[in-house]
Amino acid sequence: MAPQMQILSEELIQPSSPTPQTLKTHKLSHLDQVLLTCHIPIILFYPNQLDSNLDRAQRSENLKRSLSTVLTQFYPLAGRININSSVDCNDSGVPFLEARVHSQLSEAIKNVAIDELNQYLPFQPYPGGEESGLKKDIPLAVKISCFECGGTAIGVCISHKIADALSLATFLNSWTATCQEETDIVQPNFDLGSHHFPPMESIPAPEFLPDENIVMKRFVFDKEKLEALKAQLASSATEVKNSSRVQIVIAVIWKQFIDVTRAKFDTKNKLVAAQAVNLRSRMNPPFPQSAMGNIATMAYAVAEEDKDFSDLVGPLKTSLAKIDDEHVKELQKGVTYLDYEAEPQELFSFSSWCRLGFYDLDFGWGKPVSVCTTTVPMKNLVYLMDTRNEDGMEAWISMAEDEMSMLSSDFLSLLDTDFSN
């Protein structure tokens, strides 16, 4: 049962200094334009640190003050999105909600009920909720929820129209550094995306059509299981021996998707894994990692042979290698991955949030004990995230409810059952 929550206040946090007239309009890139209209949600759970002298009111004031300060650099986040073309950087402000939770933090993060996590967010991030249609123009919103034990949940929704996961991490790192009054704060760059990937005229935003009967579960691969999977590749072809742990976990889950799809449907379509790829380091010259926006594309791998997960690692690596200079040049001409996704196929999508540093986000009262996202109403979608100690990996898998129950016992045996839910 979801804990009772009481909203205490709601206000708009504006930049501490007005945005100059020369920066009043932020153009979307065409990589932004082709993204579905939704928000990326993240929730950070912080325990009550006994050595912290800050009470709830002081923490709240520090968060609001530092947010106002950092918005002078992240000024589009305080504006409003114009349909699918630009952001009006008018300093309207970031919705900032405060709530009291009538339960303990330990109860909230133990055996997490993923469907109940939305209550820690400022609003429903995906279409389908009662209020979701009213928030499309808001780039950023924050909700602070305080537990009876003194613990805190910080829920953030950032519009996918102007940010990818790395952009979210860049903003949160700058916010935490500002909150602690650090001097070495990462400066964002909002211009590179639209300059190198110019917007297209009259391009409609793809409509987010929620799938029905979708469930999301969190599965955890601990360090030992990841090492065992890597050892299984030792006898494989040379090109897959040095695969990353992300590629290995994607291959393992893709194999499950393939088996479930074949068991349920008699399909002749291609079985395709789509991996989100950060383009910043693949640009020539490379973009700084602080470049804001959706500086990303998708790499597509087709399953030719799939007797074992090791057969799928090679195609995954090959698809990533194809995201080279020539591919980027095609993207700059306006060619997008949507052209590929229009082909008949069974598509399984993967996005890695690993190594983005979410467990290092410290506002001045310690690091989070849990980092979560929420249910995405879209089937065959996977988010990969670090575990708290960063030596394991969480897979947040979204599937049709009946298909989730078809995951094999071999797959389930790979997981840390103390954390899967």
Curated annotation (Swiss-Prot):
Tissue and organ distribution: Expressed in leaf epidermis.
Enzyme Commission (EC) number: 2.3.1.323
Keyword Metal-binding tagged: no
Cysteines joined through disulfide linkages: none
GO biological process, one term: alkaloid metabolic process
An MF annotation (GO) of this entry: acyltransferase activity, transferring groups other than amino-acyl groups
Keyword terms of this UniProt record: Acyltransferase, Alkaloid metabolism, Transferase
Disruption of the gene: reported phenotype: Abnormal presence of stemmadenine, but normal accumulation of catharanthine and vindoline.
Annotated Pfam families: Transferase
Keyword Translocase: no
Catalytic residues in the record: 160, 362
Catalytic activity, reaction form: 15alpha-stemmadenine + acetyl-CoA = O-acetyl-15alpha-stemmadenine + CoA
InterPro entries: CAT-like_dom_sf (IPR023213)
Origin: domain of life: Eukaryota
Region of interest: Disordered: 1-21
Pathway as given in its UniProt record: Alkaloid biosynthesis
Task performed by this protein: Component of iboga and aspidosperma monoterpenoid indole alkaloids (MIAs, e.g. tabersonine and catharanthine) biosynthesis pathway from 19E-geissoschizine. Acetyltransferase that catalyzes the formation of O-acetylstemmadenine from stemmadenine.
Known partners and oligomeric status: Monomer.
Family under the similarity heading: Belongs to the plant acyltransferase family.
Name by which UniProt lists this protein: Stemmadenine O-acetyltransferase
Gene, per the UniProt record: SAT
